[in-house]
């Protein structure tokens, strides 16, 4: 048996990256939160100096691009939307994109992202302004995404000594990037830190007031590249862990983004012999339908099946019900294709496969090993961490409990674990609205330390040890 229900309101409504939030009926002067950086960026002392009325804050993720429209004078957030990064056609992760650049296809990647930004701008501006009225665009992303967007040489990002083509804040006109409707906009990319820790990580650090926090503070921006930062009494160290796109639904057999039809939550109710599925509903009163599984559903499924011993500690999925004494409602779902999460009347079942579990293990092991390496570098134990921020569009929609059970998050006191949402996007918005905030990113970029995980001998062993699906 299975019970399917609409995902909780906050899971869907709060999923800013996957919906258009239309606030046409609100005005900047009516909104009491227009100066709240959690809701509308920061209205700075420099806002009155902005020559344009409209600006865009963009988070160019490896898998997902998030864009928000702001009115510059009031600081009001007008609308937001996201789309899958069009560059995924040429590779799911950073290394694949760099490989295509080395093979002479960088111009194609540049064209894809620039066209996508113009298309998204047309959509997000509708009802508010023309794209030609956008005066300022602040874009953040990992170093590779920023280099491709700006047409910079990516050869230094592919191998040791890993050297970016530029450092500091990058500014140019949209026309220099071949933009048409955004040709008059000033395009600004805040400073990054190193070849694999980019402007998005700096935006996270800045938006969380990371450097001013007392004690030991850790932040993990979970995405295709998990960027990790550790501040110990003002000393900042960073690294980038290649998590892969599994958390965003990519490279999963029936994976998808967090949109209508996605399984966003999984619970196994042994006492009633049911599997409970939380499914993201469509608009209005459309009936629920199940199409696949998104990142939060993947974590829940792995956690639930691990607790029932359908998945072993090493990540192996049971091949036969006879291997464990399972209740019939679980045993009947073990098939040659994998574990049947959803049984469709039309035969369009949704499975969790062995490959899916391996993709999860690779992603979570990368994050765990990266965190452990930074802690070791600063000679800090996990118990000494005062606050752990989990950032990223994906990070705001997962179960803390299941993330800890599977070993994605460390097992620390619940009050120390803070879900920060899309902190990179918030940082981009703050940089859009405040020149002072923007300049702060340059200071962070030049003062932060960096650990290149690929060059650390112990990283591979740390990574292999972290593959086990257990709390840590």
Tell where the protein language model's regions lie, with residue ranges.
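A contiguous, well-structured pocket-lining segment that forms one wall/lid of small-molecule binding clefts
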Residues: 306-378
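N-terminal glycine/serine-rich phosphate-binding loop of ATP-dependent small-molecule kinases
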Residues: 1-148, 155-158, 188
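Glycine-rich phosphate-binding loop and adjoining helix at the ATP-binding site
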Residues: 93, 131-134, 148-203, 247-252
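Acidic, glycine/GT-rich loop-and beta-edge segments that sit at the periphery of enzyme/chaperone cores
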Residues: 1-10, 186-201, 211, 430-472
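Glycine-rich phosphate-binding loop of actin/hexokinase-like ATP-binding domains
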Residues: 61-62, 67-69, 75-93, 156-169, ...
């Amino acid at each position: 048996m299975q019970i399917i229900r609409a995902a909780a309101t906050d899971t869907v409504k709060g999923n800013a990256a996957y919906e258009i939030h239309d606030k046409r009926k609100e005005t900047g002067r009516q909104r009491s939160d227009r100066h709240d950086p959690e809701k509308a960026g920061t209205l700075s002392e420099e806002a009155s100096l902005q020559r344009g009325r409209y600006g865009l804050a963009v988070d160019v993720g490896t898998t997902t691009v998030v864009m928000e429209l702001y009115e510059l004078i009031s600081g009001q957030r007008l609308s937001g939307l996201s789309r899958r990064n069009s560059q995924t056609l040429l590779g799911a992760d950073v290394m694949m994109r760099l490989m295509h650049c080395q093979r002479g296809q960088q111009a194609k990647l540049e064209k894809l992202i620039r066209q996508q930004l113009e298309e998204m701008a047309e959509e997000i501006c509708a009802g508010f302004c023309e794209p030609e009225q956008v005066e300022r665009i602040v874009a953040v992303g990992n170093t590779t995404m920023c280099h491709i967007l700006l047409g910079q040489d990516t050869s230094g990002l592919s191998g040791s000594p890993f050297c970016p083509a530029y450092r500091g804040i990058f500014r140019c006109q949209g026309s220099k990037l071949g933009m048409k409707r955004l040709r008059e906009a000033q395009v600004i990319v805040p400073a990054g830190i190193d070849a694999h820790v980019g402007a998005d990580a700096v935006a996270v650090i800045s938006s969380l007031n990371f450097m001013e926090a007392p004690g030991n503070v850790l932040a993990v921006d979970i995405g295709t590249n998990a960027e990790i930062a550790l501040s110990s009494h003002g000393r900042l160290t960073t690294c980038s862990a290649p998590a892969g796109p599994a958390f965003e639904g990519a490279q999963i057999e029936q994976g998808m983004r967090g949109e209508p039809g996605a399984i966003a939550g999984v619970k196994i109710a042994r006492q009633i012999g049911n599997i409970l599925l939380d499914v993201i509903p469509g608009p209005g009163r459309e009936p629920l339908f199940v199409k696949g599984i998104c990142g939060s559903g993947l974590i829940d499924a792995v956690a639930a099946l691990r607790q029932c011993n359908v998945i072993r500690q090493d990540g192996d999925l049971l091949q036969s019900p006879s291997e464990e004494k399972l209740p019939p409602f679980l045993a009947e779902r073990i098939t040659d294709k994998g574990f049947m999460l959803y049984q469709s009347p039309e035969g369009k079942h949704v499975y969790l496969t062995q490959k899916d579990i391996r993709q999860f293990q690779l992603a979570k092991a990368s994050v765990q090993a990266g965190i452990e390496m930074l802690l070791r570098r600063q000679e800090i134990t996990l118990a000494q961490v005062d606050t752990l921020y989990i950032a990223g569009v994906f990070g705001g929609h997962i179960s803390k409990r299941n993330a800890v059970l599977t070993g994605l998050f460390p097992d620390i006191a619940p009050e120390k674990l803070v879900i920060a949402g899309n902190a990179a996007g918030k940082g981009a918005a703050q940089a859009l609205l405040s020149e002072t905030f923007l300049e702060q990113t340059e200071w962070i970029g030049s003062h932060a330390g960096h650990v290149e995980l690929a060059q650390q001998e112990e990283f591979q062993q740390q990574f292999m040890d972290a593959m086990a699906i257990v709390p840590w």
